[in-house]
Amino acid sequence: MNVILCSSNMLKGLYDISGVEVGQHLYWQIGGFQVHAQVLITSWVVIAILLGSVTVAVRNPQTIPTNGQNFFEYVLEFIRDLSKTQIGEEYGPWVPFIGTMFLFIFVSNWSGALLPWKLIELPHGELAAPTNDINTTVALALPTSVAYFYAGLTKKGLGYFGKYIQPTPILLPINILEDFTKPLSLSFRLFGNILADELVVVVLVSLVPLVVPIPVMFLGLFTSGIQALIFATLAAAYIGESMEGHH
């Protein structure tokens, strides 16, 4: 009973995280919900960039790929290799999910450094990378949790829950908490790194000449790409773990 109560509190805490705010926000009222307008605007921009670039690159696919098509085929091959390494031979159905997570996070992270969001003035707050907001990272982490539960239940049925008493039933509470802390770690890791990177650049730009922060900005681009890779790798690893039943 205590384990169930603790798990319930963990889920409630994860939901409450969406109320965390850093700075001012512009709010939109959609139905009965109040949403952060900055996150929606920048997320739509990122999605438009992804859809537009893919459409332009592969609208006339060639047998021998060139330019944009060649680039996206390389990206697809990279994501397939990543999924196969972490999930195993049954990786195929999960490539679109892992690829979507990786590309959205990667472009979102880079948009914070490369796009001139600050030039767009809002009544309240300012635009920034979508992953700069905890709501976005939680929204990315929760489907990942659903995905690895779904993968395990689809592969093993109710026998999937047997992993919680392995290697001994004494570890039942810890094994349950482990699954509920995975989305927490995914969301906070991504949010914290992207927010910290943008704050460091803003502080340096305000304190020293423009040329000095440039190396830090390049480092930020590198770490932003690494964060996207880490998120996608962990998501694939969790799915593979739930299907194999080992840690």
Curated annotation (Swiss-Prot):
Protein's name according to its UniProt entry: ATP synthase subunit a, chloroplastic
PANTHER family membership: ATP SYNTHASE SUBUNIT A, CHLOROPLASTIC
Source organism: Acorus calamus (Sweet flag)
The UniProt record lists the keyword Mitochondrion: no
Top-level taxon in the UniProt lineage: Eukaryota
Keywords: ATP synthesis, CF(0), Chloroplast, Hydrogen ion transport, Ion transport, Membrane, Plastid, Thylakoid, Transmembrane, Transmembrane helix, Transport
Family label: Belongs to the ATPase A chain family.
Segments passing through the bilayer: 38-58, 95-115, 134-154, 199-219, 220-240
SS bond partners: none
Chief localisation class: plastid
Subunit-structure text: F-type ATPases have 2 components, CF(1) - the catalytic core - and CF(0) - the membrane proton channel. CF(1) has five subunits: alpha(3), beta(3), gamma(1), delta(1), epsilon(1). CF(0) has four main subunits: a, b, b' and c.
InterPro entries for this protein: ATP_syn_F0_a_bact/chloroplast, ATP_synth_F0_asu, ATP_synth_F0_asu_AS, F0_ATP_A_sf
Source organism phylogeny: Eukaryota, Viridiplantae, Streptophyta, Embryophyta, Tracheophyta
Any one GO MF annotation of this record: proton-transporting ATP synthase activity, rotational mechanism
Pfam families (alphabetical): ATP-synt_A (PF00119)
Subcellular locations according to the entry: Plastid, Chloroplast thylakoid membrane
Membrane topology: Multi-pass membrane protein
PROSITE patterns: ATPASE_A
Transmembrane helix is among the record's keywords: yes
Summary of the function given for this chain in its UniProt record: Key component of the proton channel; it plays a direct role in the translocation of protons across the membrane.
One annotated Gene Ontology cellular component of this protein: plasma membrane
Gene from which this protein is expressed: atpI
